[in-house]
Swiss-Prot record:
InterPro entries xref list: IsoCit/isopropylmalate_DH_CS, Isocitrate_DH_NADP_dimer_prok, IsoPropMal-DH-like_dom
Ligand binding (NADP(+)): 114, 348-354, 361, 400, 404
Source organism of this protein record: Helicobacter pylori (strain ATCC 700392 / 26695)
Site (Critical for catalysis): 169, 239
Name of the molecule in the record: Isocitrate dehydrogenase [NADP]
Family: Belongs to the isocitrate and isopropylmalate dehydrogenases family.
Keyword Glycosyltransferase: no
Gene that encodes the chain: icd
Cofactor binding description: Binds 1 Mg(2+) or Mn(2+) ion per subunit.
UniProt catalytic activity: D-threo-isocitrate + NADP(+) = 2-oxoglutarate + CO2 + NADPH
One annotated GO biological process: glyoxylate cycle
Disulphide bond pairs: none
Length: 425
């Protein structure tokens, strides 16, 4: 299918990334859509582009170059397109051309987004994921030398596969007192004989869908990642001890998939199991842990965990808790993926009070771009960014959030930190 935008201009240069035989085929001048983002997006996204262009130039000496293509979602989108009568109020914030571009060009990157205030609008980040069925939220967490509240942050090296399309984040909920809430509570009490709603007259109510298909496709991706990246274990994190038919089912379906598709063998009497990595013969342990115990274990024994597969709400808590251990969400990268599309993103918010001050840490979106380059197979450029980040932090020329926690640090602006990274390539 050709990309035929109704409002945006087509890209003026570059070539399309394609998929053949389930593999990404990346030309030397790929078109990469980017969403600048709201608030501090105007600070961090140009810094990221500068770092990425420098890494690509240094790694490939001009042979490869990204053709950046700006697309629009959020406040900037609304300000640009609010007078377009052919767009609905929702489309003025979430441009249909943008969805089409992200789907068509396969790989994209975005800054943080403002969610519009008012009825009918939920998170734009969630809307993007749901519209394109980007069912994996991928959050790698490792230490780059930044200030940390824990004694041994270097022991943290995990990759979280968070299910993106289900759980209570599906947004199936109704306000207390609404006709829908009353109707559903009445149905539960009278048809299904539910007696556990403590205050039925004053309850808002929500639904938590967890499916076998949703679980299997997430767990499959997590195990494939462990195989491809030589990881020692995959841990299912859940609250199946309390929610047996949703989170408990997630765990059971996960183990069943590992056994059925990857020939995992039960250890002792289970449920843990083990499979051989077909690429190198090493053992990969498939295990599970209750979510609250896991949040303790990542502090006490982080080196025992590698790839994590979990549902939406747990994944949100876990990825931010882990990020805090290695320097905070200011440098936590992330991506949203399905079987063909990868959308990489800054994982923090818009921080409007810092917008335009050239002050904040651009690390999150820069490291998300590093993930993007690796996803594209441009490993040499990605490696340059990782080493430049480590060297920049070691040099103590850092943005204010790190400078205030480091002895002898020199505080630099957002754009200057990008320059420090480039000097360290």
């Amino acid at each position: 299918m050709a990309y035929n935008p109704k409002i945006l201009q087509k890209p003026k240069e570059g070539e399309e990334i394609t998929i053949k035989d389930n593999k990404l085929h990346v030309p030397n001048h790929p078109i990469i859509p980017f969403i600048e983002g709201d608030g501090i997006g105007s600070d961090i996204t140009p810094a990221m582009i500068k770092v990425v262009d420098s890494a690509v130039q240094k790694a490939y000496k001009g042979e490869k170059k990204i053709a950046w293509y700006e697309v629009f979602v959020g406040e900037k989108c609304y300000q640009k397109f609010k007078d377009y009568k052919e767009l609905s109020p929702e489309e003025q914030w979430l441009l249909p051309d943008t969805i089409e571009a992200i789907n068509h060009y396969k790989v994209s990157i975005k800054g943080p987004l403002t969610t519009p205030i008012g009825e009918g609008f939920r998170s734009l980040n969630v809307a993007l994921r749901q519209k394109m069925d980007l069912y994996v939220c991928l959050r790698p967490v490792r230490w780059y030398g930044s200030p940390s509240p824990v004694k041994e942050p270097q022991k943290v090296d995990m990759v979280i596969f968070r299910e993106n399309s289900e759980d209570i984040y599906a947004g199936i909920e109704w306000q207390e007192g609404s006709a829908e809430a009353k109707k559903l509570i009445h149905f539960l009490q009278n048809e299904l004989k539910v007696k556990k709603i403590r205050f039925p007259e004053s309850s808002g109510i929500g639904v938590k869908p967890i499916s076998k298909e949703g679980t299997e496709r997430l767990v499959r991706k997590a195990i494939e990642y462990a195989i491809d990246n030589d990881k020692p274990s995959v841990t299912f994190v859940h609250k199946g001890n309390i929610m047996k038919y949703t989170e408990g089912a997630f765990m059971k379906w996960g183990y069943a998939l590992a056994q059925k598709e990857f020939n995992a063998q039960v250890i002792d009497k289970g449920p843990w199991c083990s499979l051989k990595n077909p690429k190198n013969g090493k053992e990969i342990i498939i295990k599970d842990m209750i979510a609250d115990a896991f949040l303790q274990q990542i502090l006490l024994r982080p080196s025992e965990y590698s790839v994590i597969a979990t549902m939406n709400l747990n994944g949100d808590y876990i990825s931010d808790a882990l990020a805090a251990m290695v320097g905070g969400i200011g440098i936590a990268p992330g991506a949203n993926l399905n079987d063909t599309v990868g959308m990489f993103e800054a994982t923090h918010g818009t921080a409007p009070k810092y917008a335009g001050l050239d002050k904040v840490n651009p690390g999150s979106i820069i490291l998300s771009a590093e993930m993007m380059l690796r996803h594209m197979g441009w490993v040499e450029a990605a490696d340059l960014i990782v080493s430049a980040m480590e060297k920049a932090i070691k040099s103590k020329k850092v943005t204010y959030d790190f400078a205030r926690l480091m002895d002898g640090a020199k505080e630099v602006k957002c754009s200057e930190f990008a320059s420090v990274m480039i000097e360290n390539m």
